[in-house]
Amino acid sequence: MDRRDGYIMNEIMLRAENIERTYHAGSVDVPALKNCTLEFGQGEFTAIIGKSGSGKSTLLRILGSVDEPDTGSVIIAGKKITGMKDKELSEFRRRNIGYIYQDYSLFPEFTAYENVVMPILIDGKKPDENEVDDLLEELGISHCKNK
């Protein structure tokens, strides 16, 4: 059993096996990923770096279940997500995957408060007002709560 920074590193949290993804631009096939296999253990931090067009965003969309590979499989916390039905995948994604886009995606017509509680409401839960206020304070945006 390997220990790093207080984490027990014996459990594979994410595994991608033989991922391939090709985009089709008219009569031209553009391979983005070819035979990509990787795994990440619990508590690991990983940077994915490469030149523009090297497949980083494609890989992250597939690992985050936003896109499907042409071939291969993705397993998160022991559950194979490739090939899941839409409803099951949506539920799994909502409960287990956090995906942050390069450009922030706030709803401009909503207040800061409404943007913060949106995921809680989508999950069918009632937001804890004190927790939301604490979060807004921690983020330094409590003055924007109703803006």
Feature locations, PLM:
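Helix-to-loop junction immediately C-terminal to a conserved catalytic motif
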Residues: G64
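The feature captures the beta-strand-to-loop junction immediately N-terminal to the Walker
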Residues: I49-K51
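ABC ATPase NBD coupling module
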Residues: S27-V30, I81-G98
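Conserved ABC transporter NBD signature motif
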Residues: G72-K80
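Conserved ABC ATPase "signature" region
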Residues: K79-K80, P127-C144
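Short coil-to-helix segment of the ABC ATPase nucleotide-binding domain corresponding to the Q-loop/switch region
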Residues: F110-P119
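A short, flexible loop at the N-terminus of ABC-type nucleotide-binding domains that lies
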Residues: N10-M13, T22-N35
